[in-house]
Amino acid sequence: MVTLTFLLSAAYLLSGRVSAAPSSAGSKSCDTVDLGYQCSPATSHLWGQYSPFFSLEDELSVSSKLPKDCRITLVQVLSRHGARYPTSSKSKKYKKLVTAIQANATDFKGKFAFLKTYNYTLGADDLTPFGEQQLVNSGIKFYQRYKALARSVVPFIRASGSDRVIASGEKFIEGFQQAKLADPGATNRAAPAISVIIPESETFNNTLDHGVCTKFEASQLGDEVAANFTALFAPDIRARAEKHLPGVTLTDEDVVSLMDMCSFDTVARTSDASQLSPFCQLFTHNEWKKYNYLQSLGKYYGYGAGNPLGPAQGIGFTNELIARLTRSPVQDHTSTNSTLVSNPATFPLNATMYVDFSHDNSMVSIFFALGLYNGTEPLSRTSVESAKELDGYSASWVVPFGARAYFETMQCKSEKEPLVRALINDRVVPLHGCDVDKLGRCKLNDFVKGLSWARSGGNWGECFS
């Protein structure tokens, strides 16, 4: 274990990285505080993890409202960063593909005509302006939803040590504080700060970013399953594209790259992502369903229950959540950082609002470690299954850009013991492993008992065998 190198975010505040400038959150028609991204939903809600957050409140089987006889006593948020440019390696790959098409095509027919003059200008890794605004909106929504607590509380905030994750936390704070300052009923107007930034390293335990489980990191299962499914649906698209781009020879992987560009180009074009990229019109609605399922397969067999060590990557966070909900020391020997979780300054147990910022892959592992998708049958490797058929699981429903999970404890007049509830992107996910009620909740002690797999360390020992 390397020496502790967490950063107190006071330094970030002093350096001016957290902007206090007013924002026009919610004023754009495509992306709003309440509903998220709602433009071209037949396409944009099928971009897998590259979909911008959209509210699943209309997909509820039970109400997400707080029962009248209950009050929220604690809330934990786990958030993905906002919309970003492609990763550095993929940005280079996409640019190379566009350049090759332009160099080899003798004609650009039909909907592919735009490629003749398309100029690849996407950056790499960082949030787009739209992605920044997503997190401002998320901070506003969080304050509004939990106003009864937030008026008098300063949330404790952590972030994994990636620039886009840290920036997402800062933008969330901007939105949260904007909403608080606009609330005449707020009694504690102190601004939150990112109190802990956990380094991302193969040698540093980090519950918000996988990396230390050697056997898991070497696994190629998710990529293999995704490649096999791509081989089932991409050839027809490839043939059509080559017909419209004579002189060009594409691979199945190139087809997926062109589909990826639909989202990445859209979220980078304007600050509100209101202009749908011309890449999007190259594919049919049915093809977008297959693309969305491809991404769901990759996450399930890469980081979820489809990978023997997938859920194990979420054990550490699960045990941190248990500690926070029960106000007791962390009991874990997997990916938690013992130096951090044993220090009240870096892991307090007396807060009532916690906010953590992470990545999509780690969030998938965490959700499966928590058993939230225990009702999801193993995904078919050959045929598309909908989110409803998979008990609410799909990449776009679970980990879109700006995804957020709320874990609540509530005290109700009809119950002596606190109740626990989980919401993912505004959809109540009924708990598993405990005596769940009609509102998807379990009593706190029963919920903790139901997490016996994570509490015992699961199969973490296989990481190094």
Swiss-Prot record:
Main localization of the protein?
Answer: secreted
The UniProt entry annotates the active site at H81 (nucleophile)
The record's keywords, sorted A to Z, are:
Disulfide bond, Glycoprotein, Hydrolase, Secreted, Signal
Asked whether the keyword Heme is assigned, the reply is no
Recount how this protein's activity depends on pH. Highly active from pH 3 to 5 with 4-nitrophenyl phosphate as substrate, and from 2.5 to 7.5 with phytic acid.
Q: How is it used?
A: Phytic acid is the major storage form of phosphorus in plant seeds and, thus, in seed-based animal feed. Phytases are therefore of considerable economic interest.
Q: Where is the signal peptide?
A: 1-26
What are the thermal characteristics recorded for this entry? Able to withstand temperatures up to 100 degrees Celsius over a period of 20 minutes, with a loss of only 10% of the initial enzymatic activity.
> Where in the cell is the protein located?
Secreted
A Gene Ontology term for the protein's cellular component = extracellular region
InterPro entries per the record?
A: Acid_Pase_AS (IPR033379), His_Pase_clade-2 (IPR000560), His_PPase_superfam (IPR029033), Histidine_acid_Pase_euk (IPR016274)
**Gene3D superfamilies for the chain:** Phosphoglycerate mutase-like (3.40.50.1240)
What pairs make up the disulfide bonds?
A: C30-C39, C70-C412, C213-C463, C262-C280, C434-C442
| EC number(s) from the headed UniProt entry | 3.1.3.-, 3.1.3.8
**Amino-acid positions noted as binding 1D-myo-inositol hexakisphosphate in the UniProt annotation, renumbered to this chain:** Q49, Y50, R80, H81, R84, T87, R164, D209, K299, H359, D360
Recorded GO MF terms:
3-phytase activity; acid phosphatase activity
Which reaction does this chain catalyze?
Answer: 1D-myo-inositol hexakisphosphate + H2O = 1D-myo-inositol 1,2,4,5,6-pentakisphosphate + phosphate; 1D-myo-inositol 1,2,4,5,6-pentakisphosphate + H2O = 1D-myo-inositol 1,2,5,6-tetrakisphosphate + phosphate; 1D-myo-inositol 1,2,5,6-tetrakisphosphate + H2O = 1D-myo-inositol 1,2,6-trisphosphate + phosphate; 1D-myo-inositol 1,2,6-trisphosphate + H2O = 1D-myo-inositol 1,2-bisphosphate + phosphate
Q: Which residues are glycosylated?
A: N104, N205, N228, N337, N350, N374
Q: Outline the subunit composition.
A: Monomer.
Physiological role: Catalyzes the phosphate monoester hydrolysis of phytic acid (myo-inositol hexakisphosphate), which results in the stepwise formation of myo-inositol pentakis-, tetrakis-, tris-, bis-, and monophosphates, as well as the liberation of inorganic phosphate. Myo-inositol 2-monophosphate is the end product.
Task: Indicate the family of this protein.
Answer: Belongs to the histidine acid phosphatase family.
Q: Which protein are we looking at?
A: Phytase A
Output the lineage of the source organism.
Answer: Eukaryota, Fungi, Dikarya, Ascomycota, Pezizomycotina
